[in-house]
From Swiss-Prot:
Belongs to the FPG family. Transmembrane segments: none annotated. PROSITE patterns: FPG_CAT (PS51068), ZF_FPG_1 (PS01242), ZF_FPG_2 (PS51066). Involved in base excision repair of DNA damaged by oxidation or by mutagenic agents. Acts as a DNA glycosylase that recognizes and removes damaged bases. Has a preference for oxidized purines, such as 7,8-dihydro-8-oxoguanine (8-oxoG). Has AP (apurinic/apyrimidinic) lyase activity and introduces nicks in the DNA strand. Cleaves the DNA backbone by beta-delta elimination to generate a single-strand break at the site of the removed base with both 3'- and 5'-phosphates. Its EC number is 3.2.2.23, 4.2.99.18. This is Formamidopyrimidine-DNA glycosylase. GO terms for biological process: base-excision repair.
Length: 286
């Protein structure tokens, strides 16, 4: 599943390509992709003739402000579009429209015939139209329950200490909990724990003050590094222009089972933690 760096990469692409994009037409090819009330008919009716404003991100959710063309300057809202890519969702930009591929789920056109296309092989991705009198978090439970962003002032060693105090579950499991920290998934949990020198199976409540500081620093550093490389592509993820993320080629441990550690040469091991494949160095993370 795309994590924070991948979703942020998509957000940047959408912000660049869809600035003042007038939604002249919408086609929904998969009813399953529309999660908001009323299904595709209500979704299309409410988005048509609006303009995409700013794109933001909350955890793994993409959030676009929508307004009427006449309200662009003052940015008077006419609703919000929220997107979750789930496992295999991504967007493609087409300057000139052409026949969609089999896995195309939703299409948006502007007046010039240019198109933004949502493609999702496994068809788990979701879109919501949120009316202007509602906050997205009032409609989408996943948004309402998110913890702080890793780059926010609310995320710090003191916050982690408070959240993890007395917890027996593994620190890897806690990092995957979106109610504790928004946007981190399997890839960057493994990478951050390696850089912090913490074994993924250690009980969350057993981390000392020094380890908590290291973990906070490694999380933000690893996430920033991945954003700088366009995220990670191991299967379906790509940016708006169809380019793959390149962080995977620089990963410390993720998907490097039985390869030498980039720091000490010990073979990277793979195990299951909280039901998820977990990569770690038994020497550096002892």
């Amino acid at each position: 599943m795309p994590e924070l760096p991948e979703v942020e990469t998509v957000r940047k692409g959408l912000e660049k390509r869809l600035k003042n994009f007038y939604i002249d037409n919408v086609e929904v090819l998969s009813e399953r992709s529309i999660a908001s009330n009323g299904g595709s008919n209500v979704f299309i009716f409410n988005l048509k003739d609006l303009v995409f404003g700013r794109w933001s991100r909350r955890g793994k959710y993409l959030i676009a402000s929508l307004c009427k063309e006449s309200d662009l300057i003052e940015e008077i809202p006419s609703g919000t579009l929220v997107v979750h890519l789930r496992m295999t969702g991504y967007f493609e930009w087409h300057q000139n429209t052409k026949a969609p591929c089999t896995h195309t789920r939703v299409r948006f056109w502007n007046k010039k015939g240019s198109e933004i296309r949502f493609i999702d092989i496994r068809n788990f991705g979701q879109m919501w139209w949120i009316p202007p009198n509602k906050l997205p978090s009032e409609v989408i439970n996943g948004l309402k329950n998110l913890g702080p962003e890793p780059f926010s002032k609310d995320f710090n060693p003191e916050y982690l200490k408070y959240c993890l105090k007395g917890r027996k579950r593994s620190i890897k499991s806690s990092l995957l909990d979106q109610s504790i920290l928004a946007g981190v998934g399997n890839i960057y949990a493994d990478e951050s724990l390696f850089e912090a020198g913490i074994t993924p199976i250690k009980a969350s409540g057993d981390l000392n003050g020094c380890e908590l500081k290291k973990l906070c620093k490694s999380l933000t550093r690893i996430l920033k590094a991945s954003i700088g490389k366009g995220g990670t592509t191991f299967s379906d993820f790509r940016d708006l222009e169809g380019l793959n993320g390149t962080y995977g080629g620089y990963a410390w441990v993720y998907r490097r089972n039985q390869k030498p550690c980039r720091k000490c040469g010990t073979l990277i091991e793979k195990t299951k933690v909280a039901g998820r494949s977990t990569h770690w160095c038994p020497n550096c993370q002892n």
